[in-house]
Design a protein with these regions (language model features):
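PRPP-associated nucleotide enzymes
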Residues: 2-9, 14, 21-46, 50-153
Length: 153
């Protein structure tokens, strides 16, 4: 295999980490994949951490110890999350959403992947430290949000 350049390593690291949120990948895994030294991969992870922090793309965390490595946690910056939730609240306050019996029409919102994904990431962010084993929902309309939260956890 030819020598793998840094930009190629960064692309693959980003893809693998973001495809499996909250999964800890050992540096040895990436060393074997790229044929690179741990020190080189540590530098790559540092670069990605800086970029993710600068652009609010989530958090890359290094985990120390025998089972350590690096993991990606999707996080929406607080300011962006508050703006999103404010906009969602405004939408939900529309009188046209009120159904007979005092119910609220949500089907259109809960079928929009970009909205449900953000909702799931925001909810998951509140539970990262608790390390939950599963996510439950009480009603079928909550399944998309629970699925997105579970994916982030």
């Amino acid at each position: 295999m030819d020598r793998i350049r840094r930009n190629e390593r960064l692309a693959v690291l980003t893809k693998q980490l973001t495809a499996s949120p909250n999964h800890i990948f050992t540096l040895s895994h990436f060393c074997d994949l790229f044929g690179a030294a741990k020190s080189t991969l540590s530098e790559d992870v540092d670069i990605l951490q800086d970029v993710y922090n600068a652009f609010g793309l989530g958090r890359l965390e290094t985990v120390t110890g025998a089972a350590g490595g690096v993991r990606y946690r999707p996080v929406i910056p607080r300011k962006e999350a508050v703006a999103f939730l404010d906009e969602l609240c405004q939408e939900l306050q529309s009188p046209s959403r009120l159904l007979p019996g005092g119910f609220l029409y949500l089907s259109d919102i809960l079928s929009m992947p970009d909205i449900v994904r953000k909702m799931g990431i925001i909810i998951a962010g509140e539970f990262y430290d608790a390390q939950p084993d599963f996510v439950l929902t009480m009603e079928t309309k909550g399944i998309p949000v629970a699925l997105m939260a579970a994916q982030s956890l």
